[in-house]
A protein has these predicted regions:
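Reverse-transcribing Pol proteins
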Residues: 20-151, 231-247
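Conserved pre-catalytic core of RNA-dependent polymerases
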Residues: 114-116, 166-167, 174-175
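Acidic, serine/threonine- and proline/glycine-rich intrinsically disordered low-complexity regions
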Residues: 1-32, 173
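Polymerase palm active-site segment centered on the conserved acidic dipeptide of motif C
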Residues: 168-171, 245-251
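Generic hydrophobic, aliphatic-rich segments that mediate packing or membrane embedding
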Residues: 102, 119, 152-155, 168, ...
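Reverse-transcriptase-like RNA-dependent polymerase core
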Residues: 54-84, 126-134, 151, 163, ...
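Structured helix-beta-strand junction loops
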Residues: 109, 165-166
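Well-ordered alpha-helical segments embedded in enzymatic catalytic cores
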Residues: 98, 155-158, 218-222
Length: 251
């Protein structure tokens, strides 16, 4: 599930737990179809690029992000109550095991920490295309009390127009997406979420926070502004597209 799909679900009035449960079967069928067409690293990556394999290594990317100017701030409206609570969603036995594993891994990486926050948002799991479970926080209550960040996302028609002279394309995706951005120091407790095993707060961005897309786009625009100025690199959220008229500038 993409950030955009989750943001759309998060705006609906129906319980997102119910909505996402309805999509499980479709996701499983889609994953089965994808599994039939999986290719090896050598099949997917041209030989001249294989020396960069370490750059895309999953373990190499699991590190706590540095403090940056674009750290995600959660600014609450002046009339926000001093506390709010939530219910706990029921879990299956498999989800309970996944929760314990998730908490262990996230604590080890520093992505979450135990919390004593007066705020508590609910959470549940959804099944990803690869069959694994992903934690999802239901931040609708918090989002309704958050000052909105109006930083714009790129307009799709403008991005497409920049590709008009390109003949060679390469698409890159940022691993772990939102987890590459810290929560601003002092704002972690505002994003606290209640689990069946306790209360925790995020130290990095997760799905569902209302201003996450704007924060992430700010980071990407800042880091890649020089490359984007050439017109041969276009970026939308965690998707990077290198588009050139021939091989020379592409390499």
């Amino acid at each position: 599930m993409t950030e955009e799909e989750w943001e759309e679900i998060n705006q609906q009035e129906e319980d997102p737990y119910t909505i996402l449960r309805k999509t499980t079967t479709a996701s499983e069928l889609a994953q089965k179809a994808m599994d039939k067409t999986k290719k090896t690293f050598e099949q997917m990556v041209p030989e001249e690029y294989r020396r960069h394999a370490r750059t895309f290594n999953e373990k190499e990317s699991q590190r706590f992000p540095l403090e940056r100017p674009w750290d995600h701030a959660i600014e609450l409206l002046p009339d926000t109550p001093k506390s709010f609570d939530c219910k706990i969603y029921p879990m299956t036995a498999g989800e309970d095991d996944s929760l314990r594993e998730f908490i262990r891994e996230q604590l080890e990486k520093g992505y979450i920490q135990p919390s004593k926050s007066p705020y508590a948002s609910p959470f549940f799991f959804i099944k990803k295309k690869d069959g694994k479970l992903r934690l999802v926080q239901d931040y609708r209550k918090l989002n309704s009390l958050t000052v909105k960040n109006q930083y714009p996302l790129p307009l799709i028609p403008e991005l497409i127009d920049k590709l008009r002279n390109a003949t060679l394309f390469m698409k890159l995706d940022i691993r772990w997406g939102y987890n590459n951005v810290r929560i601003k120091e002092g704002d972690q407790e505002k994003g606290a979420f209640k689990t069946n095993l306790g209360l925790y707060e995020p130290c990095v961005m997760f799905f569902g926070l209302t201003n996450s897309p704007s924060t992430f786009q700010t980071m990407m625009d800042t880091i890649f502004q020089d490359l984007m100025a050439t017109g041969e690199v276009v970026i939308y959220m965690d998707d990077i597209l290198i588009a050139t008229p021939n091989n020379t500038p592409h390499h």
